[in-house]
Regions:
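Bacterial N-terminal signal peptides
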Residues: 8-21
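Non-catalytic, beta-strand-enriched accessory regions in extracellular/secretory proteins
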Residues: 67-74, 216-218, 416-433
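Short strand-edge motifs at loop-to-beta-strand transitions and within beta-strands
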Residues: 159, 304, 427-429, 468-472
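Accessory carbohydrate-binding/adhesion or oligomerization-edge regions at the termini
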Residues: 341-413, 430, 482-505
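Aromatic-lined ligand-binding clefts that engage carbohydrates, nucleic acids, or primary amines
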Residues: 433, 437-452, 483
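Solvent-exposed beta-strand/loop surfaces of large extracellular or lumenal domains
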Residues: 452-472
Length: 505
């Protein structure tokens, strides 16, 4: 006897089969294959690849800060990465508020600076909006009748630069006066044993009120292995003799101990991709969030640049500076480096003396004319404060190198802060050796050079087009060896750079 299937059950069976076919098979209770890649590049810092095996976390903070009492707002142990910081404060004046960030139990914080500076609000300027890959700030200019909201309410401060950590991370706020506000820290918690980048977040701040035309203004200076992720810089014009932008631009002196090379800027706005001064446009990577144009020689402003598409890598050191006028400057740089990484030791003169200028730097023929008497005179021991050359009495300048770099652009200037061109100078340093030995002198520069060791000419270099490093075979005597270098400065591809790098391999 055959059992008849009721029509309604037959209909349900057909419907179920069709549904399974449409969905691609029966529903699985657990997917064995992980649909995500093991890592993904950070959108603000693509050079960092971060794990995808994480739990999404948020730590919130209700801030009631007593004067002078630090408040810990975040303290995580284990491995993780902060992806987003957000803060708001009821007080309009937070100039006395500071932030510290310490990762993996470092001896000192990787970040310690005024809160507003860290979030790109520089030189005490009124809060302004920032819409970039790394920083996003939302000032609230809305005036309401609500007595609880200040007439110019505190901005929403946001950071999107990742802060990875393998052992833990701690964030502390401190203020000299009472503060009330809130914060949210969005972060990812990694499982134990996760493979995490060795690079750790750092930030540095520099301020000069005013700057000195004879000294480069520091933006970032660090030793080790890492990369520059971005920076924000502000200008307040005090000197009305010329436009605030006309300062000769920035210099990046990279890997002095291992592979000296340079990146040279142009002028202020040009270094950020702009033209003809401050103009308030913002993109993910470059922008001008603030300007106050009161006249051609009376302007203030802020620029930012994040190097997501073109990070600046360094493997032993970075010295990042700007030429300066007697204006106010403030800069904050954001970079990542491997903790504890150090450059290899370098044999180089620890002190230099320089004398000049001489008017023979315009042609190679004039530059190479014999000066035996002068060379013998300058190769004898330390120079006094003044050196007489012919009828001229020239001042001797004492210089100390940074990572082997000797900077000359601030010593001789036609008009600040531009270095003289078509002039030459002599530099003198001492190389000490414990024995008589053969060695290699590594000399990097972007001009001409004549090199003397213990009064003997050992090399003539023509690097007039761009910065190049030469390796010169030399023989060092036991004890002190007198190194004398004649060099010049001309306009070339490096634009206004007047620096040399010297070391013995």
């Amino acid at each position: 006897m055959r059992t008849q299937i009721p029509p309604v059950l037959l209909f349900l069976a057909v419907l179920t089969a069709a549904t399974v076919q449409i969905l691609g098979g029966p529903v699985q209770a657990h997917q064995s294959a992980d649909p995500f890649p093991s890592t993904y590049p950070d959108p603000a810092v693509p050079l960092l690849s971060l794990p995808t095996e994480f739990r999404v976390r948020r730590t919130t903070a209700n801030l009631t800060m007593a004067p002078g009492k630090p408040v810990e707002i975040f303290n995580a142990t284990g491995a993780g990465c902060i992806r987003h910081l957000w803060f708001v404060f009821g007080e309009q004046d937070i100039e006395d508020l500071s932030i510290e960030i310490t990762v993996d139990g470092a001896v000192g914080p990787q970040v310690r600076m005024p809160f507003r500076s860290f979030f790109g609000a520089l030189l005490g300027f009124e809060a302004y909006p920032i819409d970039s890959a790394g920083l996003v700030n939302f000032p609230n200019f809305t005036v309401t009748n609500d007595p609880m909201i200040p007439k110019k309410a505190s901005p929403g401060w946001n950071l999107y630069l990742p802060i990875p950590f393998s052992k833990g991370c701690r964030i502390i706020l401190n203020a000299a006066s009472a503060k009330n506000g809130g914060g949210m820290i969005d972060w990812q918690q990694y499982r134990g044993g996760v493979t995490l980048t060795p690079l750790r977040f750092h930030a540095q701040r520099s301020i000069a009120q005013p700057g000195k035309p004879t000294e480069p203004f520091p933006i970032a200076e660090t030793e080790g292995t890492g990369f520059l992720a971005g920076y924000v810089m502000g200008w307040r014009q005090r000197d009305r003799s010329d436009m605030v932008f006309h300062n000769g631009g920035t210099r990046m002196l990279i890997d002095g101990q291992t592979d000296p090379h340079v990146i040279c800027g142009h002028n202020v706005e040009d270094d950020f991709g702009f033209s003809w001064g401050f103009n308030q446009y913002q993109t993910r990577w470059v922008g001008c969030p603030y300007r106050d144009n009161r006249g051609r020689t009376d302007q203030d402003g802020v620029f930012y640049r994040f190097f997501g598409p073109d990070p600046i890598l360094f493997r032993s050191s970075l010295s990042f500076t700007s030429a300066a006028r007697p204006d106010d400057y403030e800069a904050v740089s954001y970079f990542y480096k491997v903790p504890g990484s150090k450059a290899p030791p370098m044999v180089a003169p620890q002190d230099w003396q320089v004398v000049g200028p001489f008017p023979d730097g315009i042609s190679l023929e004039a530059f190479q004319e014999s000066e035996d008497d002068l060379v013998r005179h300058l190769s004898q021991g330390d120079w006094p404060g003044k050196v007489t050359v012919g009828a001229k009495e020239l001042t001797v300048h004492e210089l100390r190198p940074t990572y082997g770099w000797v900077r000359l652009e601030g010593v001789y200037q036609t008009r600040y802060p531009y270095p003289r061109t078509d002039q030459s100078v002599y530099l003198r340093g001492t190389l000490n050796s414990t024995s008589r030995r053969r060695a290699t002198l590594r000399l990097g520069l972007d001009n001409w050079a004549i090199v003397y060791l213990n009064g003997r000419r050992v090399a003539v270099l023509d690097h007039a087009e761009e910065f190049t490093t030469a390796r010169i075979p030399i023989t060092l005597d036991k004890g002190a060896n007198q190194l004398l270098i004649k060099t010049n400065n001309r306009q070339n591809r490096e634009r206004h750079l007047w620096a040399i790098h010297c070391a013995v391999e």
